UniProtKB/Swiss-Prot annotation:
A Pfam family it matches: ATP-synt_ab_C
Protein name in UniProt: ATP synthase subunit alpha, mitochondrial
One example GO MF annotation: proton-transporting ATP synthase activity, rotational mechanism
Keywords: ATP synthesis, ATP-binding, CF(1), Hydrogen ion transport, Ion transport, Membrane, Mitochondrion, Mitochondrion inner membrane, Nucleotide-binding, Transport
UniProt GO cellular component terms: mitochondrial inner membrane; proton-transporting ATP synthase complex
Gene this chain is encoded by: ATPA
Summary of the function given for this chain in its UniProt record: Mitochondrial membrane ATP synthase (F(1)F(0) ATP synthase or Complex V) produces ATP from ADP in the presence of a proton gradient across the membrane which is generated by electron transport complexes of the respiratory chain. F-type ATPases consist of two structural domains, F(1) - containing the extramembraneous catalytic core, and F(0) - containing the membrane proton channel, linked together by a central stalk and a peripheral stalk. During catalysis, ATP synthesis in the catalytic domain of F(1) is coupled via a rotary mechanism of the central stalk subunits to proton translocation.
The keyword Cytoplasm is annotated on this UniProt entry: no
Family annotation (InterPro entries): ATP_synth_asu-like_sf (IPR023366), ATP_synth_asu_C (IPR000793), ATP_synth_asu_C_sf (IPR038376), ATP_synth_F1_a_nt-bd_dom (IPR033732), ATP_synth_F1_asu (IPR005294), ATPase_a/bsu_AS (IPR020003), ATPase_F1/V1/A1_a/bsu_N (IPR004100), ATPase_F1/V1/A1_a/bsu_N_sf (IPR036121)
Compartments (UniProt record): Mitochondrion; Mitochondrion inner membrane
Site-annotated residues for Required for activity: S373
Length: 511
């Protein structure tokens, strides 16, 4: 049988079509929902899924795979599970959870997945970063040596914080934990305005976990009034958000802060507060049927916080010399710092600022318990002048507290004890500070110098706050600059501040 020319032509055409045939196949691995409830979906069929991978349900809701079991996968749902039904298809996305990062987020309020919730449109140019990454290794790190000023006299003098440190703020509810964090953000306004280069600027990330939406709105207002939003990012997983988002928010905020750390810049991140994150994680773990441990928390709750806080670091000069400083907040119940979560976080961090209800109600604000508060690495970053000025401050306050307890029982005290009580009361008074009024470091030094060197000893207690306000207003700028720049105070450099403070104290001393 012979091929006609027509058949040969057709064969050639078919061959060329088959050779050039190409289609872009997209293969999706899908599974089906076996059961759903309480924000947890059990899915069958996703055999190749990774731990921590994002999945998408038929309704468009996203989730994250946390439990990889023999028969099924336990997925926590980001959002409402009411639209998910048994038998629904679930599709792998192939990506681990990531969030936007970069300078385009500054001044914005985003949720735990990095989606803007401030009604100001989409984000500008940005990169995406995984929320869970490996922490910097030992060789990549450097000892903390640069100060991170909070603007609070009690903190910068007694529990100094350095860039790259983790300092815990711990206390009962309504003792001023968030106030310390906000004051620290506000204080960076004046610090950043003095910065001569990008490497001196400090960017701030505030992560609100399980807070009321009204509280977050109030915070945005305070920061915008203080012109602090321009260098801040707010990540909000509020009380009305599902537990998975409250669990994820600190990691998302950390990924945004790491952008600055890894690009030779400096960032401060505040987790407010990690107690609520632990509660959200406990809820998810119990619903996933993981075995409970102490206080019904899962066994890996320590790892939950340690892997987050270890990401705060001061990088070595070879890796850009950037830093990420963390201020985690923990809420205690009736001052019990020996509970499970508080002891965990205390052991992870480089020190803690302890706040007490009793001090708060006595009008000592910030209500810092100087005896329990400590900074394990911050003193290496403290300015030399501040270190010299407040060297005896902590000791004098400790002696004052000890003697004050016994002084209640008897009035016949010797002159030395009376002088100690007198000085201690004035030091306590000078460390008080109103909210949202951070003080530059050079003004803190001169005020504390006045108290430590006895310029307030003959003043009535009710006049000390007036005297303290008067010092920064009337002091010469050159004198303040010399305190910071010339590397500490020697006998020669003390002559000018002594003369100024003595003259300034006269109107306030009782006649």
């Amino acid at each position: 049988m012979e091929f006609s020319p027509r058949a040969a032509e057709l064969t050639t055409l078919l061959e060329s079509r088959i050779t050039n045939f190409y289609t872009n196949f997209q293969v999706d691995e899908i599974g089906r929902v076996i059961s759903v409830g309480d924000g947890i979906a059990r899915v069958y069929g996703l055999n190749e899924i990774q731990a921590g991978e994002m999945v998408e349900f038929a309704s468009g809701v996203k989730g994250i795979a946390l439990n990889l079991e023999n028969e099924n996968v336990g997925i926590v749902v980001f959002g409402s599970d009411t639209a998910i039904k048994e038998g629904d298809l679930v599709k792998r996305t192939g990506s681990i959870v990531d969030v936007p990062a970069g300078k385009s987020l500054l001044g914005r309020v985003v949720d735990a997945l990095g989606v803007p919730i401030d009604g100001r449109g989409a984000l500008g140019d940005h990169e995406r970063r995984r929320v869970e990454v490996k922490v910097p290794g030992i060789i990549e790190r450097k000892s903390v040596h640069e100060p991170m000023q909070t603007g609070l006299k009690a903190v910068d003098s007694l529990v100094p914080i350095g860039r790259g440190q983790r300092e815990l703020i711990i206390g009962d509810r309504q003792t001023g934990k968030t106030a310390i964090a906000i004051d620290t953000i506000l204080n960076q306004k004046q610090m950043n305005s003095r910065a001569t280069s990008e490497s001196e600027t400090l960017y701030c990330v505030y992560v609100a976990i399980g807070q009321k939406r009204s509280t977050v709105a109030q915070l945005v207002q305070i920061l915008s009034e203080g012109n602090a939003l321009e260098y801040s990012i707010l990540v909000a997983a509020t009380a009305s958000d599902p537990a998975p988002l409250q669990f994820l928010a600190p990691y998302s905020g950390c990924a945004m802060g790491e952008y600055f750390r890894d690009n030779g810049m400096h960032a401060l991140i505040i987790y407010d507060d990690l107690s609520k994150q632990a509660v959200a994680y406990r809820q998810m773990s119990l619903l996933l049927r993981r075995p409970p441990g102490r206080e019904a928390f899962p066994g890996d709750v320590f790892y939950l916080h340690s892997r987050l806080l270890e990401r705060a670091a001061k990088r070595s000069d070879q890796t850009g010399a950037g830093s990420l400083t963390a201020l985690p907040v923990i809420e205690t119940q009736a001052g019990d710092v020996s509970a499970y979560i508080p002891t965990n976080v205390i052991s992870i961090t480089d020190g803690q600022i302890c706040l007490e209800t009793e001090l708060f109600y006595r009008g000592i604000r910030p209500a810092i318990n100087v005896g329990l508060s400590v900074s394990r690495v911050g003193s290496a970053a403290q300015l030399k002048a501040m270190k010299q000025v407040c060297g005896s401050l902590k000791l004098e306050l400790a002696q004052y507290r000890e003697v004050a307890a016994f002084a209640q029982f008897g009035s016949d005290l010797d002159a030395a004890t009376q002088a100690l009580l007198n000085r201690g009361a004035r030091l306590t008074e000078i460390l008080k500070q109103p909210q949202y009024a951070p003080l530059p470091i050079e003004k803190q030094i001169i005020v504390i110098y006045a108290a430590v060197n006895g310029f307030c000893d003959r003043m009535p207690l009710d006049r000390i706050s007036q005297y303290e306000r008067a010092i920064p207003q009337s002091v010469k700028q050159e004198l303040l600059q010399s305190l910071v720049e010339k590397g500490g105070l020697n006998n020669e450099r003390k002559i000018e501040p002594d003369a100024f403070l003595k003259e300034n104290a006269k109107p306030y001393i009782k006649g």
